[in-house]
Amino acid sequence: MAKAKIAVNGYGTIGKRVADAAQAQDDMEIIGISKTKPNYEAAVAHQLGYDIYAPAANLEAFEKAGMPAAGSIEEMVEKADVIVDCTPGGIGKSNKALYEKAGVKAIWQGGEDHELAGYSFNAVANYEGALGLDFVRVVSCNTTGLCRVIYPIDKAFGTKKVRVTLARRATDPNDIKKGPINAIVPDPIKLPSHHGPDVKTVIPHIDITSAAMKIPTTLMHVHTVNMELKNECTAEDVRQVLGSQSRVRFVGQGITSTAEIMEVARDIKRPRNDMWENCVWPDSITMHEGELYFFQAIHQESIVVPENVDAIRAMMELESDGAKSILKTNKAIGL
């Protein structure tokens, strides 16, 4: 069977990871990535053997920089079966007309609104609904992390309501322009934050409210999750449910911080120190008067990467069973 031809529009924090993950699959291949300028990320892509595409006006700049582009972004789009749009939040919507004109399928990231694609995706919760779709939005890192735990718990025990407090990393490790550096910022001030409503685009029946703040760290987000459940269960019951999820990792054995989780990612030789799984502290899982509480950490740079691969597989109908796609993706990337 011919491999699906994938192009990544925007080779940044998410795009470069999606490119590597898709290239690792046996049913898809990267036919090109796009960069607007010949910076260090473009140089690395060139060294890795990816064909680089650029805005037509910038092709000469790439040539002069010693990394000649294979063509324009429009030409890249024409060659692909699926475009994974990893451009900065709010930019991707301006590319929709280009994709529609070329007749290609497209995946956007969580920085875009649900309405742009009309379908928000999480592999565990709603894979089958994306089969054959032309446009899909993979929800954000935080929403992905919430869907991965809320969906199986709700399926096992039923959910009356969910309340989440998110301590969000201020920015990514390579970003020198954002902060805060020495402050805690309620973000947004007006509640709820967008994360709860965003979960409902994937799991509509969930009653969920969220509040978020930005804190001066770049490593990971941390969620405090509170769920009021419909059916009685114990903390051990919840541990068994979460422990059965291939994209949930229990972190114990003296791990008490996001810094130590990132050290684990280094020690197990993950590419770019990525932690694709939700990292749940099993000792934090507590039941009190029918309500569940636990902490989880989310690696914002990588958690959505396997989800993008599964979205490609669903849209191209390479696999009809979401559970099988998840296992296939996991095996190929080493999760």
UniProtKB/Swiss-Prot annotation:
Keywords: Cytoplasm, Glycolysis, NAD, NADP, Oxidoreductase. Pfam families: DapB_N, Gp_dh_C. The keyword RNA-binding does not apply. One of its GO terms (biological process) is lysine biosynthetic process via diaminopimelate. InterPro entries: DapB_N, GlycerAld/Erythrose_P_DH, GlycerAld_3-P_DH_AS, GlycerAld_3-P_DH_cat, GlycerAld_3-P_DH_NAD(P)-bd, Glyceraldehyde-3-P_DH_2_arc, NAD(P)-bd_dom_sf. It is an enzyme of class 1 (oxidoreductase). Pathway: Carbohydrate degradation; glycolysis; pyruvate from D-glyceraldehyde 3-phosphate: step 1/5. It catalyses: D-glyceraldehyde 3-phosphate + phosphate + NADP(+) = (2R)-3-phospho-glyceroyl phosphate + NADPH + H(+); D-glyceraldehyde 3-phosphate + phosphate + NAD(+) = (2R)-3-phospho-glyceroyl phosphate + NADH + H(+). NAD(+) binds at residues 13-14, 111, 169, 300. It comes from the Archaea. Its main location: cytoplasm. Its EC number is 1.2.1.59. GO terms for cellular component: cytoplasm. The keyword Cytoplasm applies. Gene3D superfamilies: Dihydrodipicolinate Reductase, domain 2, NAD(P)-binding Rossmann-like Domain. One of its GO terms (molecular function) is NADP binding. The active site is at 141 (nucleophile). HAMAP family: G3P_dehdrog_arch. Homotetramer. Belongs to the glyceraldehyde-3-phosphate dehydrogenase family. This is Glyceraldehyde-3-phosphate dehydrogenase 2. It comes from Methanosarcina acetivorans (strain ATCC 35395 / DSM 2834 / JCM 12185 / C2A). The lineage of its organism: Archaea, Methanobacteriati, Methanobacteriota, Stenosarchaea group, Methanomicrobia.
